[in-house]
Regions:
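Bacterial N-terminal signal peptides that target proteins for export
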Residues: 2-13
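N-terminal signal peptide c-region/cleavage motif recognized by signal peptidases
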Residues: 21-23
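Primarily a LysM-type cell-wall glycan-binding module
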Residues: 26-50
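Short acidic beta-strand-loop surface patches of small beta-rich interaction domains
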Residues: 56-69
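Non-catalytic propeptide/linker segments at domain boundaries
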Residues: 72-115
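Active-site histidine-acidic residue metal-binding/catalytic motifs
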Residues: 97-199, 222-225
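Structural recognition of the beta-strand scaffold that forms the well-ordered cores
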Residues: 110-114, 157-161, 213-219, 233-236, ...
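Active-site-adjacent mobile loop/cap segments within catalytic or ligand-binding domains
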Residues: 208-209, 222-225, 261-328
Length: 328
């Protein structure tokens, strides 16, 4: 084979490779033609696209293919935008930061997630042999897992208490530190200042997002006598009907899950009214969760086992999805 033939063959292979790549792209680009009398919104919905999310991009991709007021034209093939299928949240840690969007069940919902204590305040402390379990570390891990669940259903999530070094951890005994911040700001030692700081952070975000469904979720672990076992329970502010409904939906979902996975166990989680600082001072409807007694060895299994932390977060998220559906 002479040099000219080799060059020609390489050129043909490169051209073929380019055509193959183009073909693959073309194959993955979704197109469709409208049905008689079908409007733009119905066309998007029939093809599995959220109207408010994808309408503008659809119009941009199909410029000059519309009738009056963006009416669809029969016989015209319209191109659909690529769906966003992943979102990045670095606070979840290297292994979890890329979250796949599984569906749009929470599209339009905004959540402000606060894990209890943090920074100079570890919260309740339990001793297991030589190990110290700090409330803030376990509440933070469950909160991150909850954030991941909510993001996977296409919610908007603000993580208020943050530790850039931790991410979701799969250890039983979580290392303790004081690196947590409130949206990047140092957490004060004074309790009232600390609580007001996180309320201010939520309210500042809420100023620009208050037209939609917005909820605050605060996660803590309780500390009682070693012999006291408790189930997850939830607080809402006395005058907040929306906070009460959210709390009740979550507790109802937890009861359903425990009844299914542990028949005969029973579930005594409750919803109660409280005038706690963060419930009173955050403007969006809020729910305050206590996940169990950190001093009780059986309750601790709910926190020590990573699979249990994951399950609790997922079940809470399912209850939150139910509440969002009720708001529509």
């Amino acid at each position: 084979m002479n040099i000219s033939t080799k060059i020609l063959n390489r050129t043909l292979l490169l051209a073929l490779g380019t055509l193959m790549c183009t073909f693959v792209v073309a194959q993955t680009q979704h197109t469709d033609t409208p049905q008689q009398g079908e409007g733009l919104g119905a066309f998007l919905l029939r093809n599995g696209y959220n109207v408010s999310k994808y309408k503008d991009k659809f119009i941009e991709l199909n410029a000059n293919r519309f009738g009056k007021d963006y009416g669809l034209l029969l016989g015209v093939k319209y191109v659909f935008p690529d769906k966003q299928n992943q979102i990045e949240e670095p606070l979840l840690g290297e292994a979890n930061k890329m979250v796949t969007i599984e569906d749009d069940e929470l599209y339009g919902a905004t959540y402000y997630l606060i894990s209890g204590h943090g920074g100079p305040d570890p919260g309740a402390i339990a001793k297991v042999g030589e190990k110290e379990l700090h409330e803030d570390e376990y509440a933070y891990d469950v909160m991150l897992r909850l954030a991941k669940c909510l993001l996977s259903h296409n919610a908007k999530v603000h993580i208020i208490i943050q530790d850039p070094n931790d991410g979701i951890r799969d250890d039983a005994y979580l290392s303790n530190d004081d690196h947590e911040t409130c949206v990047g700001a140092a957490i004060p030692l004074d309790q009232n200042e600390r609580l007001q700081q996180r309320c201010d952070a939520v309210n500042n975000f809420y100023k620009t997002e208050r037209t939609g469904y917005c909820r605050t979720v605060i996660i803590h672990l309780d500390s009682r006598t070693e012999s006291t076992r408790i189930d997850v329970f939830a607080y809402h502010f006395t005058k907040s009907k929306m906070g009460q409904r959210l709390a009740q939906n979550v507790i109802d979902k937890l009861k359903t899950k425990y009844d299914y996975y542990q028949p005969g166990r029973g579930f005594l989680g409750e919803v109660k009214e409280r005038q706690l600082y963060v419930l009173r001072e955050t403007n969006p409807p809020a729910m305050f969760l206590e996940l169990g007694n950190i001093q009780n060895d059986k309750d601790r299994l709910r926190f020590i086992k990573p699979s249990n932390r994951k399950a609790v977060a997922e079940w809470v998220a399912e209850g939150m999805i139910e509440d969002f559906k009720m708001s529509k």
